[in-house]
Curated annotation (Swiss-Prot):
Described function: Catalyzes the isomerization between 2-isopropylmalate and 3-isopropylmalate, via the formation of 2-isopropylmaleate.
Protein name: 3-isopropylmalate dehydratase small subunit
Protein family: Belongs to the LeuD family. LeuD type 1 subfamily.
Gene Ontology molecular-function annotations: 3-isopropylmalate dehydratase activity
Organism: Rhodopseudomonas palustris (strain HaA2)
Name of the gene: leuD
Pathway(s) served: Amino-acid biosynthesis; L-leucine biosynthesis; L-leucine from 3-methyl-2-oxobutanoate: step 2/4
SUPFAM superfamilies found in the cross-reference section: LeuD/IlvD-like
Amino acid sequence: MDKFTTLEGVAAPLKIINVDTDMIIPKQYLKTIKRTGLGKGLFSEQRYQDDGSENPDFILNKPAYRSAKILVAGDNFGCGSSREHAPWALLDFGIRCVISTSFGDIFYNNCFKNGVLPIRVSQDDLDKLFDDAERGSNATVTIDLPAQEIRGPDGGTVKFEIDPFRKHCLINGLDDIGLTLEKKASIDSYEDKLKTERAWA
């Protein structure tokens, strides 16, 4: 998992509440267990029209937001069924941070496990970030995870809270396997101790 320290990029405003995981990545993309290639399926029912052409009105199809790294979204983002493909699709598209007032619990946890930072902010702060994001490609936003703050294009800041353990994992790029490897020396030492104490076993 790639480390997450500071992220600077365009923020795309998605002013829709209750975006569920089926909207993020529709069920037809769930057959694969590969994490790559899912970016094409991200919001596919909104990004594409029935004939397969792009919907020019959808935010991520607009020129200013095609390379967005940050998504500013309405309340209750990622609700619905458990679908780890949802953060995979965001990440494969290039989005590493989602900002909202609240998230679906399972989606929220899956984001951390896959290197995507979900940030909860107040409604007032979200409205300010929507205003920043609507400035298009001029709306460069910086996410500073060590400092736990969001910096807008005009220098304004929004502080955010994050669990210290999850912060540690993101900054160091540690997924479940990485966490185990981080403790490898302690695990090896414990196993050696057991072998000595229970040589009969």
